[in-house]
Amino acid sequence: MVKVLVVGLGKMGISHLSMVRALCGVEVVGVVDANAYLLGVLRKYTGVATYGTLDRALEEAAPDAAIVATPSRLHAPMVRQLLDCGIAVFCEKPMTLSAAESDELAELAAERGLVTQVGYHNRFVGTFTEVRRLLDLEAIGSVTHGLAEAYGPVVLKPATGTWRSKRTEGGGCLYDYAAHVLNLVNWYLGQPCAVGGTTMTSVFSRETDDQVASTLTLPGGGSIALSVNWSDESVRKMTTRITLWGTGGRIFADRQEIQVYLRDGTPPPDGYQPGWNVKYTTELTPAESFYLRGEEYTAQLEHFVTRVRTGTLEGINTFASAAETDRLIEWLRRDAGQHRDPALAPDVPNGVARASLSARLRSLVTAR
C-alpha cells in the first residue's frame, strides 16, 4: 500500500485527490491546506485526516509519497522539505519559478534515490504519445519546422485577486499554458539552442501575460513557432496543437486526433501508408481505472504510484526533464525583456532610458 499525502486543495489539488483515492493500492493518509473551513468540510464528508501545515502532516501522517498542488511560488520550499524527509514527490507544473532551483531539486532527488514526477499530462495523451513514437521511428525524416499552439478562454475580462493573475506568484499564460507545449517540444525535439522574437502580451491582465509568441531554434537548424493565448473565447476549453514538418512528411496532433502525411518514397511505419493517415484518441488511448477530466490525468498518477511502489527512478516527466522546460521558460522571459538579469544588461531606470533615447533622436535631427 502506497501512503500518499496531498498538499494544496485548489482546483488541481481537489482533482488529484479524487483520482488518487480511487487508485488500487493507495491510501491517502492526509491532506494539507491553509483553509480551515475547506479542511473541515473535507474531513466531515470523507473522513480523510487534514492538516493546516506541512510540518504537522509530516510528523503524524508518515507518507511514502506526496502530491504538491499549491501555488507555484510555494513549490520549491515544499518540495525540498519533502525530499529532505525521503518522500517521493509528484509536483504540479511548473516545477519552480527558477531554473536553477529546479536543477537543484532534480539533483537532490537523484542523490537521495527518490521517485519524482511533474504534472505535464500531455505526455499521457494517446495522440501526443503517438507523435513521439513516430518521431523515434523517423517517420517524417528530419524535422525542419514546427508550430506549437495552446489556446483557451481563461481570462476574458479584467480581473485580479488570485495568484494566477500575478506573474510573481507563477501565474500567467507563459507558466500556465505555454509550459505545456514547451514541454512537448522538449519531449519531441530536445532543448532548443536559442529563442528569439519573444513577445508576452497582456490583453486583460494587469500583472501578467495573456499571450505568448516566440521562435525556438533547434540544434539541427530547424525552428518551432510558439503561439499561445489564454484569452481566446473562440475555443470552449484549453486546446493544445502540435504541427511538425519534416523531410519525409508532416504530423499534426491535438487531443482528439493525429493526422500524418507521408511522402512517396518514405517507408511508412506499421499501420500507416503513403499520403494522408488519421488516427483518433479513442484508438490510441488505453482505458484507465478511473475517469475524471480526461484519461491522461489518471494515467499520470497511476504511472507515479507504480514507480513509487516499484522504486523505479526512470520514468515520464521526472524532475530532470521538467527542469529543462523551466529553463526554456526562463529563456523566453529574458528574451521578452520581462526578466532583467544584471549579468546580461545594466539596470537602467525607464525614465533614464527614455531621456537617453530622446537625446539621441534630437541629435540626429540636428545633424541633418
List each model region and its residues:
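Short, structured coil segments at secondary-structure junctions
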Residues: 24, 45-47, 85, 188
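Conserved SAM-binding strand-loop segment of SAM-dependent methyltransferases
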Residues: 48-54
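N-terminal Rossmann-like dinucleotide-binding module
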Residues: 1-45, 361-364
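C-terminal helix-rich "cap/oligomerization" subdomain common to oxidoreductases
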Residues: 65-68, 289-291, 296-368
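Predominantly a Rossmann-like dinucleotide-binding segment in NAD(P)-dependent oxidoreductases
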Residues: 122-205
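Beta-strand-loop-alpha-helix segment that lines the small-molecule cofactor/substrate pocket
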Residues: 58-60, 65, 71-72, 76-123
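NAD(P)-dinucleotide binding in Rossmann-like oxidoreductases
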Residues: 204-207, 222-299, 315
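Short, Asp-centered acidic motifs that coordinate Mg2+ and/or phosphate
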Residues: 30, 65, 145
